[in-house]
Curated annotation (Swiss-Prot):
Role summary: Catalyzes a reversible aldol reaction between acetaldehyde and D-glyceraldehyde 3-phosphate to generate 2-deoxy-D-ribose 5-phosphate.
Species of the source: Geobacillus thermodenitrificans (strain NG80-2)
Subcellular location: Cytoplasm
Record's keyword annotation contains Nucleotidyltransferase: no
Name of the protein in its database record: Deoxyribose-phosphate aldolase
Gene Ontology CC entries for this record: cytoplasm
Keywords of this entry: Cytoplasm, Lyase, Schiff base
InterPro entries, sorted: Aldolase_TIM, DeoC, DeoC/FbaB/LacD_aldolase, DeoC_typeI
Catalytic residues, chain numbering: D91 (proton donor/acceptor), K154 (schiff-base intermediate with acetaldehyde), K183 (proton donor/acceptor)
EC numbers: 4.1.2.4
Length: 223
């Protein structure tokens, strides 16, 4: 595979105990390897933006994370605040319970609130949390994300057990077609797995093992 995997990696550190020193190291690694972005919790966006101010590496953060169980208004506020602090990509979690309740109108409105808050200022990736969904629910979630104007659909938070699978990535790609990107996250710890996800249709990889992936090693625990 000749694709530049580094340019597809969101170099991720979302552990609650992450320190400022570790966030700075994450940014240094992203600069060194030319990753697409660093993905950090909202409290670290300013730090990451400062560290990456003179680079092409984008700052990504998470919204309604990891449960997705906040209101559309709260997610919109989080998005605005993150953008003010320097985020250029936001990964939001859908209202999973609403999806499972069949309340597609709320799911779409929830996504749209973030899309509108980010409009013209940040990419929006929609985490559907595949480990908690049936295939039918995965398809519906992806359709709603596209309908609401999201830029990407994303498999997982990394906090709900299972992560990305080739099967889920392929299903998501078939569902969105060329209308959105697909981000595989959770459990991608080596180059072989990353390449399998890309072959299945992923256009972005979320991982805390970015350095291991580009250097042919195997990374440790997720996020």
């Amino acid at each position: 595979m000749t694709v530049n995997i580094a340019k597809m990696i969101d170099h991720t550190l979302l552990k609650p105990e992450a320190t400022e020193e570790q966030i700075i190291q994450l940014c240094d690694e992203a600069k060194q390897h030319g990753f697409a972005s660093v993905c950090v919790n909202p409290a670290w966006v300013k730090t990451a933006a400062r560290e990456l101010s003179d680079t092409d590496v984008r700052v990504c953060t998470v919204i309604g994370f990891p449960l997705g169980a906040t209101t559309p208004e709260t997610k919109a506020f989080e998005t605005n605040n993150a953008i003010e602090n320097g985020a250029r990509e936001v990964d939001m979690v859908i209202n999973i319970g609403a999806l499972k309740s069949g309340n597609d109108e709320l799911v779409e409105r929830d996504i749209r609130a973030v899309v509108e808050a980010a409009s013209g200022k940040a990419l929006v990736k929609v985490i559907i949390e595949t480990a908690l969904l049936t295939d039918e629910e995965k398809v519906r979630a992806c359709q709603l994300a596209v309908k609401a104007g999201a830029d990407y659909v994303k498999t997982s938070t990394g906090f709900s057990g299972g992560g990305a699978t080739v099967e889920d990535v392929a299903l998501m790609r078939r569902t969105v077609g060329d209308k959105a990107g697909v981000k595989a996250s959770g459990g991608v710890r080596d180059r072989k797995t990353a390449e399998a996800m890309i072959e299945a249709g992923a256009t972005r990889i979320g991982t805390s093992s970015g350095v291991a992936i580009v250097s042919g090693q195997t990374g440790g625990a997720d996020y």
